């Protein structure tokens, strides 16, 4: 059985313009994967609650890259699961279709790629992390929900937030422009 969310009343196709983005946040791949990963029930619950609320409130966005990575990660054999995968290929593709149907997905542009190169150099981000950050930076999303960045740090105009930390409040770090 699918762990999909209930479809929203109106689907949005293609890229979003991201107007009025002050309250919008970008979700990294790890949040999507934890929703289907039984190895950490606490993170699984947090990811589910976060995604359900974001879908209902329409405050979260996905990068096209996160959907691609989601399929790759959930179908990769894992040593600690005895070589099993989190999902079969068919299950992962079904969930990827649900993500495309239910969420506003942002696609890369030339500006995103140029910004990612700058982020890779300036912040010493790995290439794929730089691309996720660049989507948020270029499209004006103020927060990036991910455990792969330094929690509370500003990368340009984007603040990284680790939704899986057990710390009360948000600890802000100064912007490093």
Q: Residues of each region from the PLM?
A:
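Short acidic, glycine/proline-enriched helix-loop-strand junctions
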Residues: 95-98, 102-110, 114, 151-177
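Amphipathic alpha-helical interaction segments
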Residues: 49, 65, 69-72, 94, ...
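Short beta-strand segments at enzyme active-site cores
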Residues: 61-65, 145-146
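Acidic, metal-binding active-site segment of PIN/NYN-like and related structure-specific nucleases
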Residues: 5, 9-13, 130-171
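Short, well-structured N-terminal submotif of metal-dependent ribonuclease cores
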Residues: 1-62, 77-91, 167-173, 177
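Acidic active-site catalytic centers that drive phospho-/nucleotidyl reactions
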Residues: 28-30, 69, 129, 148
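Active-site neighborhoods of divalent-metal-dependent phosphate/nucleic-acid chemistry enzymes
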Residues: 13, 19-20, 102-145
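Helix-adjacent hinge/juxtasegments
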Residues: 74-108
């Amino acid at each position: 059985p699918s762990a999909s969310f209930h479809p929203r009343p109106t689907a949005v196709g293609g890229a979003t313009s991201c107007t009025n983005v002050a309250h919008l946040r970008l979700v990294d791949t790890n949040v999507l994967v934890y929703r289907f990963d039984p190895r950490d029930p606490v993170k699984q619950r947090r990811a589910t609650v976060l995604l359900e609320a974001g879908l209902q409130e329409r405050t979260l966005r996905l990068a096209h890259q996160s959907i691609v990575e989601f399929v790759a990660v959930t179908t990769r054999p894992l040593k600690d699961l005895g070589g099993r995968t989190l999902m079969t290929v068919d299950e992962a593709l079904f969930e990827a279709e649900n993500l495309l149907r239910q969420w506003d997905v942002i696609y890369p542009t030339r500006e995103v790629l140029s910004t990612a190169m700058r982020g890779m150099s300036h912040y010493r981000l790995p290439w794929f992390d730089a691309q996720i950050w660049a989507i948020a930076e270029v499209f004006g999303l103020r927060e990036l929900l991910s455990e792969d960045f330094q929690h509370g740090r500003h990368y340009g105009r984007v603040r990284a937030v680790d939704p899986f930390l057990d710390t009360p409040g948000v600890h802000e770090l100064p912007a490093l422009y």
